[in-house]
Amino acid sequence: MVLLESEQFLTELTRLFQKCRTSGSVYITLKKYDGRTKPIPKKGTVEGFEPADNKCLLRATDGKKKISTVVSSKEVNKFQMAYSNLLRANMDGLKKRDKKNKTKKTKAAAAAAAAAPAAAATAPTTAATTAATAAQ
C-alpha cells in the first residue's frame, strides 16, 4: 500500500475513478488513525503511548492498486472540501432507485394478502347460506 500526501492522494483517487468509470468499483475506507504501525498487544497496555494529534486514515483501492493517506485534524477542513468536490465530480454514474415499482409491488402484495383471508372467511359463509337455502 502506498502512503501518499493529501494532494497526491486526491490526484491518484481521480485516476482510479477514471479507470473504473466504464466498469469496476472503487472502494474507499475511512477510519481513525492513532499513529501506530504495530498491532496492539492482546494482554496489557502499551506504556507511554499517547497520540499527539487526532488523525484520519483514508484508503482507496480498485482491487489491484491500493493508495492511502493520513489527514491530521489541522488539515481536515481543507481536505474534506477537496474530497467532497472530487466525489461529486466522479460519482455521476450512480442511478436513483426506482421507487414506483417497489411501491406498486408492495401495495399489490398487501392487497392480495388482505383479500385472501377475507375471501376465505366469506367463502364458507356463502356456501353455508347456499346449502341452507337449497335444503329448504
Curated annotation (Swiss-Prot):
Localization per record: Cytoplasm
Designated name of the protein: Signal recognition particle 14 kDa protein
Quaternary structure annotation from Swiss-Prot or TrEMBL: Heterodimer with SRP9; binds RNA as heterodimer. Component of a signal recognition particle (SRP) complex that consists of a 7SL RNA molecule of 300 nucleotides and six protein subunits: SRP72, SRP68, SRP54, SRP19, SRP14 and SRP9.
Domain of life, per lineage: Eukaryota
PTM sites of type Phosphotyrosine: Y27
Keywords: Cytoplasm, Phosphoprotein, Ribonucleoprotein, RNA-binding, Signal recognition particle
A single cellular component GO annotation: secretory granule lumen
Gene Ontology biological process terms, A to Z: cotranslational protein targeting to membrane; protein targeting to ER; SRP-dependent cotranslational protein targeting to membrane
One Pfam family linked to the record: SRP14
Residue segments, region Disordered: 116-136
Main location: cytoplasm
Cystine pairs: none
SUPFAM superfamilies documented for this protein: Signal recognition particle alu RNA binding heterodimer, SRP9/14
Species in which this protein is naturally found: Homo sapiens
InterPro entries on file: Signal_recog_particle_SRP14 (IPR003210), Signal_recog_particle_SRP9/14 (IPR009018)
Function, in words: Component of the signal recognition particle (SRP) complex, a ribonucleoprotein complex that mediates the cotranslational targeting of secretory and membrane proteins to the endoplasmic reticulum (ER). SRP9 together with SRP14 and the Alu portion of the SRP RNA, constitutes the elongation arrest domain of SRP. The complex of SRP9 and SRP14 is required for SRP RNA binding.
Similarity comment: Belongs to the SRP14 family.
Molecular-function GO terms, alphabetical: 7S RNA binding; endoplasmic reticulum signal peptide binding; RNA binding
Gene name per UniProt: SRP14
